[in-house]
Amino acid sequence: MAKKLRRRSRSPLEKKARRGFRGYPVATIAFYGPNDEIASKVAVSIVPAEGAEADPLERWFSDDLDVRRDSTIGEEILAFIRRHEAKSVVMADRIIGCPHEEKIDYPEGEVCPECRFWAHRDRWSGDIIH
């Protein structure tokens, strides 16, 4: 008898994102961390209509647990999405950069002094930029 392959368990957020575009408003979810292994921040915004600016924007942080594995943060994100009646969810499939914000946490145009991993690295591919 052939063994059944077990599918990797997906989070409710991953399931929503896999459904694809279902109209506006769209919730966008992006993960950030000091490297490409641990997400210490997640930012979720609502894009109300095509061409509109993302508003509102909410951020969650964790110093001790990867935010992708934190069930409390996951539930709060789902509640945020429901509250703003998002029909679609778009989520990056990886950590896309440093959790610190340019012009807020460090000067514009400079590299974050706390997250050297992301210095000179393309945040979408993870490749080092020469």
Locations of the language-model features?
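Long, charged N-terminal interaction/targeting segments
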Residues: 1-82
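Cys/His-clustered metal-coordination modules, chiefly Zn-binding fingers
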Residues: 79-130
